[in-house]
Each structure stands twice: as structure tokens, then as C-alpha cells.
């Protein structure tokens, strides 16, 4: 079993080290992670400059680019053999609902999915790593299940783990994505030189945390396991849009 491991918090993040340690005896691991924190980088690729790859003292490879860069470079330039699985994380904070659109952790996994490789993104819901060992144990259990019974279609799974002791986790629930309220306003401040600058505000609170959502599972102390897809087509609107666009199609 060949496993590629990445993240978005950077190659020296505790979450990455914990995930690698938890999976170390499950196969041949290759670690390729960003040089610095790229939280919120989403699926961005670096196209305006070359990328460099260096090796840390612990053997981890790190790239001066985004999480997507890391997986892309690993799959197309660093690894001689295609991995059987790609895992990303463990992220320092939740990736619930709308977070998945911005998450570098999820983006690393989705890049592997684009190459037809099963991928799993892991996140510890609260920041600070208080119960990181518990999250790593839960991540291992899920990876073990994927190894023992691989999902038929290349899977893209988003996993959020409550910040609590392993013994207090209330199992795993298969969920859909919930939804957040819009983000808080930007925070405006002034630099010592008199320039006005803006910080992106905090994420919004849960707007859809009903039963069946990832938010609901986490609030109830369960690990949320959400299957994702990258096809953004709104199939339910195709027929309506065809009728709406008919005059344009005929006379543009």
C-alpha cells in the first residue's frame, strides 16, 4: 500500500506529524507538504514561478507552493509509482459545510481525486491540537477501513473529528455538507505607516446544522464522514436553462 500524505498547515505542523505516525505501519508513506501555512488556499496552483522541493531532517519533502501544488508535483514529478491512496491533514480546525470550498486540506485531497486516486481529508474541529492523538487514531481507523474494503469509485472523503478524547467519540456518521451563515465583516486596521489594511473576518456560524449534516454530527460528538464530488454542474437546471437560452442560441 503506497500512501501520499500532504496538508495545508505546512510540513512542520503537528497534525501532519501525528497523521504520518498513525499511518506509518500501514504502507509505504511519502510526505509532500507546503513549506508554510496555506490555509484557505483552496485549489490554487502556482503558475507564475517555478516550484522548489526540499527535504526536511525527518524525511518529509516540502514545496514552496500550495497544497494543490504539493500533490500535483508529487503525482507528476516526484513519485515513480502511483499511490494507492492520498490523505491530507490533520488540519488545525474544522472544514465543515462551505469551508470545503476554501480549504487547502480538502484541495490537496481533491487534486488526487482528479487523478483518479482515492483521497481523504482529515480535520480536527477545534484549533489548538488538544486531542490530536485521538484524531490520529480515528484517522487510522478510517484508512484501515479503506485499505480493507476500498470504495468502488475513487473516493473523495471529507472527515471532521470532534476535539475530544477517543473514548468519548460517538462513532462515525455519514453526512452531507451543512451550510454556514455569511462570514463576519472584514476587520479594518491601520499600519504604522498610515495605510489602511483589511483582515478577512471570522467564518459565519452554522446556518444548516440539521440532522444529517456534518455540523450536526460534530455537535453530537460524532466523527463526520462526507463524500464529496467535483462536478459542479447543476443538472436540475439544465432543462430550464436550455429554454431560457433558446433565443440566444438561435440569434446570438
From Swiss-Prot:
Broad class of enzyme this protein falls into: hydrolase
Protein residues bound to a divalent metal cation: 8-9, 39, 91
Presence of the UniProt keyword Nucleotide-binding in the record: yes
InterPro entries: SurE (IPR030048), SurE-like_Pase/nucleotidase (IPR002828), SurE-like_sf (IPR036523)
SUPFAM superfamilies given in the database record: SurE-like
UniProt-listed NCBIfam families: PRK00346.1-3, PRK00346.1-4, surE
Task performed by this protein: Nucleotidase that shows phosphatase activity on nucleoside 5'-monophosphates.
Protein name: 5'-nucleotidase SurE
Source lineage: Bacteria, Pseudomonadati, Pseudomonadota, Betaproteobacteria, Burkholderiales
Amino acid at each position: 500500500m503506497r500512501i501520499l500524505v500532504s496538508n495545508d498547515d505546512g510540513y512542520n505542523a503537528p497534525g501532519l506529524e501525528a497523521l504520518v505516525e498513525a499511518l506509518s505501519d500501514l504502507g509505504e508513506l511519502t510526505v509532500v507538504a507546503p513549506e508554510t501555512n496555506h490555509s484557505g488556499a483552496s485549489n490554487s496552483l502556482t503558475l507564475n514561478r517555478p516550484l522548489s522541493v526540499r527535504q526536511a531532517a525527518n524525511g518529509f519533502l516540502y514545496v514552496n507552493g500550495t497544497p494543490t501544488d504539493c500533490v500535483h508535483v508529487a503525482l507528476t514529478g516526484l513519485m515513480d509509482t502511483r499511490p494507492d491512496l492520498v490523505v491530507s491533514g490533520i488540519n488545525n480546525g474544522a472544514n465543515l459545510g462551505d469551508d470545503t470550498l476554501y480549504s487547502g486540506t480538502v484541495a490537496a485531497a481533491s487534486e488526487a481525486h482528479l487523478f483518479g486516486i482515492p483521497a481523504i481529508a482529515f480535520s480536527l474541529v477545534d484549533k489548538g491540537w488538544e486531542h490530536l492523538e485521538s484524531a490520529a487514531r480515528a484517522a487510522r481507523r478510517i484508512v484501515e477501513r479503506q485499505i480493507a474494503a476500498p470504495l468502488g469509485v475513487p473516493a473523495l472523503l471529507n472527515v471532521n473529528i470532534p476535539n475530544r478524547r477517543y473514548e468519548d467519540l460517538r462513532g462515525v456518521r455519514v453526512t452531507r455538507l451543512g451550510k454556514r451563515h455569511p462570514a463576519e465583516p472584514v476587520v479594518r486596521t491601520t499600519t504604522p505607516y498610515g495605510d489602511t489594511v483589511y483582515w478577512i473576518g471570522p467564518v459565519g456560524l452554522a446556518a444548516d446544522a440539521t440532522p444529517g449534516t456534518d455540523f450536526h454530527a460534530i455537535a453530537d460528538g460524532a466523527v463526520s464522514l462526507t463524500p464529496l464530488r467535483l462536478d459542479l454542474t447543476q443538472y436540475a437546471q439544465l432543462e430550464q436553462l436550455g429554454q431560457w437560452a433558446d433565443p440566444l442560441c438561435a440569434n446570438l
